[in-house]
């Protein structure tokens, strides 16, 4: 809602914000200032514009039939000042609600990692590659998801230039040669096997998927799904996953611009595996430079990058 979006932006910018709540579009009549500030509406955004660009923004929103209203301005006061019907109804220092607010300090302990599966290389040598491949490709976590995405129209408005099934979806930007690439990735087993490395890996996977279609990665959002934070090991998984996410995004200069946390995902006190999901977006400056995953011609060269040993301990191959 307006509370978190306005205060967080003011805090990050080291500024204040003045909002006229009488100008906020509301679905219900006679909403109080308290209700307006706490109401959470899906797909509603708060944007800070450069002065003088209001009409330019309005034309864009009008084109797509979206509600748009100028509801306030940034200030140097470092306070959140709210007005309703020409009366000031709140005047609070921003840092009181952000940097200086009380924080949870939950107890946590390092998650107990699952036992490593002993890989018998000699036994694997007796397996038939065809049988192994068929079994792996039939697993729900690996198999084609076409049966899902073929059920909806992924070419609405004719802007899709790379359809589902590749490393990332790509849609063109109207009036330009540019395109936006998007990928959503998650790996619960990896994060369960090693939360710190799993957190790093999921950010890197999003990055790799975007560059694989020719895009420059810009930013990510996350959805962090975990068990009860009151369980110290579950909380430990969360702490280490978030640490991994942070380290990888900082190293790759791939900022996390938004996200949410979902706790208490459990059945009979048994929590789910740590499941951070990452949504990444990137920019392709010229659609002509977009890359697809299919081989282009005979004698294409295939490369393996990085070490290929020591990754089987919790792999689908070893577990199944």
Predicted regions mapped to residue ranges:
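Glycine/proline-enriched, intrinsically flexible loops and inter-domain linkers
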Residues: 1-320
């Amino acid at each position: 809602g307006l509370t978190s979006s306005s205060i967080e932006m003011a805090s990050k910018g080291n500024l204040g914000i003045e909002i006229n709540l009488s100008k906020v579009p509301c679905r219900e009549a006679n909403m109080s200032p308290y209700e307006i500030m706490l109401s959470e509406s899906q797909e509603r955004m708060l944007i800070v514009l450069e002065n003088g660009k209001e009409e330019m923004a309005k034309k864009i929103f009008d084109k797509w039939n979206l509600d748009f209203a100028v509801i306030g301005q940034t200030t140097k006061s470092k306070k959140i000042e709210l007005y309703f019907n020409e009366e000031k109804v709140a005047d609070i220092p921003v840092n009181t609600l952000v940097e200086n607010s009380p924080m949870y300090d939950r107890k946590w302990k390092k998650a107990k990692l699952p036992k490593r599966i002993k890989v018998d290389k000699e036994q694997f040598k007796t397996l038939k590659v065809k049988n192994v491949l068929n079994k792996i490709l039939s697993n729900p976590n690996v198999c084609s998801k076409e049966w899902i995405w073929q059920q909806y129209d992924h070419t609405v408005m004719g802007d899709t230039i790379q359809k589902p099934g590749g490393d990332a979806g790509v849609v063109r930007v109207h009036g330009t040669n540019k395109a936006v690439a998007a990928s959503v990735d998650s790996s619960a087993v990896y994060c369960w096997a090693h939360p710190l490395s799993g957190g790093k890996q999921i950010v890197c996977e999003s990055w790799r998927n975007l560059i694989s279609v020719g895009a420059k990665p810009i930013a990510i959002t996350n959805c962090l799904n975990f068990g009860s934070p009151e369980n110290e090991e579950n909380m430990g998984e969360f702490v280490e996953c978030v640490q991994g996410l942070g380290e990888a995004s900082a190293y790759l200069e791939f900022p996390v611009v938004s996200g949410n946390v979902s706790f208490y995902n459990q059945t009979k006190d048994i929590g789910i595996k740590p499941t951070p999901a990452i949504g990444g977006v990137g920019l392709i400056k010229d659609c002509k430079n977009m890359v697809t995953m299919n081989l282009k011609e005979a004698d294409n060269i295939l490369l393996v990058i990085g070490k290929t040993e020591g990754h089987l301990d919790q792999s689908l191959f070893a577990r199944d």
